[in-house]
């Protein structure tokens, strides 16, 4: 069958990779590059070329089983990545790294810091209260700030840990993090095993930049037709699908919006 895939993010690329084994596939992309969120830049540092990712950066086999399997089958190299989190608050003077037990108390003065110990206490309470909660039972309109107020979480836990972490995860100003839905935060933390102290997933990154897997798909799946073209319209008949671009119309059996 002739199949059109509109969009070349990971969903479109994965579909193209699998379907091209048995079908004639065409991928449409309105941008001037394939890969969607994947954005690898090649920089030269002291005479050495270095691939730097500014879009898609990390993955793990627990949350991304199909993606991990695809990389293995394509022969794309990966390596372990450090997804640690640390805080250096220039206003309060608090510094800590909770990634390891020894790094958490690397600064002896934190042992005697009442606010730091309060933050740790609330952190453990937040983990314990939310790791097994059914997200479906959470009010979708309840913000994380409202939840923290309701359960009397400290200012230190919010501004020295939870808010900075959420801000780093979603590129959001710390001042606005409190408005994020509590349900969304808990769902994300549960899904990525961030509410447990043990058995957290080992994060991985693609060697030579995430764009490596795009090149691998294009090399392996030479039958795929790649088009830099914005789709203007899609129309259906009982038997076919018409894709319209500035170049004209093309006919397919199926279309996938990715």
Task: Name every feature range the model reports, one short phrase each.
Residues 7, 82, 227-230, 245:
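Short loop/edge segments at beta-strand edges and connector loops
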Residues 20-44:
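Glycine-rich FAD pyrophosphate-binding loop
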Residues 61-182, 186-187:
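Mobile amphipathic helical/loop "lid" adjacent to a hydrophobic cofactor/ligand pocket
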Residues 41-67:
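N-terminal glycine-rich dinucleotide-binding loop that anchors FAD/FMN and/or NAD(P) in oxidoreductases
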Residues 2-27:
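N-terminal Rossmann-like FAD-binding beta1-loop-alpha1 element of flavoenzymes
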Residues 187-238:
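Helical element adjacent to the flavin cofactor pocket in flavoenzyme catalytic cores
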Residues 233-250:
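Conserved beta-strand-loop-beta-strand element in the redox core of flavoprotein oxidoreductases
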Residues 6, 250-258:
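Short hydrophobic core segments
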């Amino acid at each position: 069958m002739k199949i059109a895939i509109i969009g070349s993010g990971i969903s479109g690329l994965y579909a193209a990779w699998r379907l091209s084994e048995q079908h004639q596939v065409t991928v449409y992309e309105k941008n001037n590059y394939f890969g969607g969120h994947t954005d690898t830049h090649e920089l030269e540092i002291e005479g050495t070329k270095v691939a730097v990712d500014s879009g898609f950066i990390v993955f793990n086999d627990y949350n991304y089983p199909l993606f991990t399997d695809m990389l293995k089958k394509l022969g794309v190299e990966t390596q372990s990545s450090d997804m640690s989190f640390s805080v250096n608050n220039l206003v309060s003077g608090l510094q800590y790294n909770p990634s390891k037990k020894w790094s958490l108390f690397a600064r002896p003065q934190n042992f005697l810091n009442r606010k730091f110990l309060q933050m740790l206490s609330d952190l453990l309470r937040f983990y314990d209260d939310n790791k097994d909660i059914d997200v479906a039972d959470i009010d979708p309109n309840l913000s994380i700030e409202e939840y923290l107020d309701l359960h009397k979480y400290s200012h230190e836990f919010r501004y020295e840990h939870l808010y900075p972490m959420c801000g780093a995860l979603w590129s959001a100003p710390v001042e606005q993090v409190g408005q994020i839905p509590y349900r969304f935060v808990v769902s994300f933390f549960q899904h990525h095993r961030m509410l447990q102290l043990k058995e957290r997933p080992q994060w991985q990154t693609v060697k030579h930049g995430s764009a490596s897997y795009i090149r691998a798909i294009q090399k392996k799946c030479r039958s795929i037709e790649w088009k830099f073209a914005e789709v203007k319209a899609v129309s259906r008949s009982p038997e076919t699908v018409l894709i319209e671009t500035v170049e004209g119309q093309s006919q397919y059996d199926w279309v996938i919006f990715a």
